[in-house]
């Protein structure tokens, strides 16, 4: 074992803190670099290996950038509201505030033991009143701009968590947190109008340096569709309904229409003889989640309402069906069915023996879903694609039965939660004045401590008289506070704006400072947030820009998703499986730098992989070996009597590896390819060891320059160990104030190269030649090689082909 241990970690962490080494200078923003990892949720009592995989390597990247001359801002905080702490409190009796702050204290200690450059003076904790005061301010600003509103709506309800879930929090019909089946309820809820920004959220995506998969997920979630809205009248009635379609050119092929079970028209147009069956079907549909109902693999079901609609383009009667695959929250809650040209409609029509009529030519069989000439479509026969669509829409417009329309899959953001542990919504209800905003000067509306929060389906704050009963700020009369709390994603939708100005008591942030500090230059976190946090943060940034607070469009310019660290068994880590990895145990045994380097060398950063104890031991041995080599190098420099100043063959060989390492590591670490960066360091280590092992006079000055570069390259990956080695070579300033080395292109031009020599296409030898050798000299060296002579034997040499500095091929027969 070498001398490196947690004692060295603690020594340098103390020095860094005493010297305020990493304190951010917000007065010098010319080369600022805002580096941000998604903050952690303090639901568990400790950080696990997955947290480390997010934070450790990114800190190494930030250190590298600091050494390149950037003024790095790397804050840290905690996303501290939410269900897990409340559920833990219900289970254990420990108040969410108490457990959350205890966990935060533990995690802060762990994060500091990592030795990262976190700017702790800029810490934010979302459950602190001095933070959620400004979350409430944000809500009020959105309300003032008409971007926050309340309405009764069908919502996803988790009967176990006893709260509303956003669509994004329902996975395959189950709650993402507790795996319970999700129900539907009609409740008065608060929403944010993210749909107002649907177009811009799409348009700006391609400009971002984000993973293509994440951008594709957001595009799909927003789901822009350009088409037409068509009006169908109900036969023998004054009722009508609209449908949205992207294929209005298939309108002549409509043979039935389908309404969502929740559609208000269902009760009005269902005939008495069909009522019982329809009611039964509605009950069945109510127990399905939106995502489950939209599943591609699920068989589509429906019931006939007994009524008919009139196809506006040809006047034909078509049956009106009720089907749960139609969502009342998407489009108009009604769809037209063209079974000849839609796979879903074809399957439904086949199942229920409904007519199938071709109106687009092409394909040998049905359904045919591509574009083609219109057929069986009267005056429109022969028209294609956009021309066909335009003609049909024009006809519908002339009849006042249709128009062009753009539709979105994206729904407004539901932010009400019927739970305790969240930011109270700053709204008051007065019988005289109606809905009233809490005045800014009365913020924060503080979350009371003594509340009965056992879940019963109602908002816990509604049962707290001291909280719920208040005075109307307008008329001074008795009033009630809003009992719901805000979705935790509201808290995290703007936290990146608070970090640089976290002690501001007058405003959420100083726009002058924030507009210089942001956008975030590098954001790192898991891909699971693609359609929630990342989308919400983009929306909030744009909304605040339009209010005049921000002068930029996007919060995060560059985004990287780290991979997933699995248990030793290759499965996702969980306490129930007993395969979790505690960083603390390994740090105690190996030190923080070995743990950090293992995470960066053992896994591709964006892929992750399974944990291996053997692999971390190998990294520990590597650090010990580096320590021995650097000690030998110091001794060589110190005791060198017959020093030389020339750069001979051995020096040139080491110098080549040195500058190749500088070039490769600089390129790879910049792209967060940490594993290949450390592989280059290992090659550099081998080259140093080889040079130290030669029995010849050495160039001590060159050796010192080489180990200075080596330690500098090592520093981002093993910060404590590198600081210690830096001091041992006699330099008193921090290595993190050192300039990152630059490679010398001349050092990468070799005097000699190794080339392969083939006989009849098979490699028979390798020879070293001067890079300045002529073609004749290369031929001569190849033909004089003993292995080549033996391979040729008595054969006659017919041809010698030379590819300079790469290959010699001898043809002999």
Swiss-Prot record:
GO cellular component, as recorded: cytosol
Keyword Ribosomal protein: no
Top-level class of the enzyme under EC nomenclature: ligase
Motif 'HIGH' region, chain ranges: 40-51
Top-level taxonomic group: Bacteria
CDD domains associated with the record: Anticodon_Ia_Leu_BEm, LeuRS_core
A single BP term in Gene Ontology: leucyl-tRNA aminoacylation
Enzyme Commission (EC) number: 6.1.1.4
Principal cellular location given in the protein's record: cytoplasm
Residue numbers binding ATP: 575
Motif 'KMSKS' region location, chain numbering: 572-576
Reaction catalysed by this enzyme: tRNA(Leu) + L-leucine + ATP = L-leucyl-tRNA(Leu) + AMP + diphosphate
Keywords: Aminoacyl-tRNA synthetase, ATP-binding, Cytoplasm, Ligase, Nucleotide-binding, Protein biosynthesis
Pfam families recorded: Anticodon_1, tRNA-synt_1, tRNA-synt_1_2, tRNA-synt_1g
Subcellular location: Cytoplasm
GO terms for MF: aminoacyl-tRNA deacylase activity; ATP binding; leucine-tRNA ligase activity
Family label: Belongs to the class-I aminoacyl-tRNA synthetase family.
Protein name as catalogued: Leucine--tRNA ligase
The organism of origin for this protein: Clostridium botulinum (strain Hall / ATCC 3502 / NCTC 13319 / Type A)
